UniProtKB/Swiss-Prot annotation:
This is Uncharacterized protein YlaF. It is a multi-pass membrane protein. It comes from Bacillus subtilis (strain 168). Keywords: Cell membrane, Membrane, Transmembrane, Transmembrane helix. It is found in: Cell membrane. Disulfide bonds: none annotated. GO terms for cellular component: plasma membrane. Pfam families: DUF5325. The chain crosses the membrane at residues 7-27, 34-51. The keyword Cell membrane applies.
């Protein structure tokens, strides 16, 4: 069984939460919140993919 990578799991949950925030701000009709949530999704997803690439290059991922 493979070892669980908790940091990547945290990034995944943060991305899901950010996507949920987009829906909340759409319901509240808050353009600033929608834009902030979209920026947050891009930042979290980008950070997660960057971290995964670095870990793969270092041989920490299978």
């Amino acid at each position: 069984m493979k070892k669980m990578n908790w940091l990547l799991l945290l990034f995944a949950f943060a991305a899901v939460f950010s996507i949920m925030l987009i829906g909340v701000f759409i319901a509240e009709k808050s353009p600033a919140g929608i834009i902030a949530s979209i920026v947050l999704v891009c930042a979290v997803m980008g950070g997660g993919f960057t971290l995964k690439k670095k870990m793969r290059e270092q041989g920490l991922l299978d």
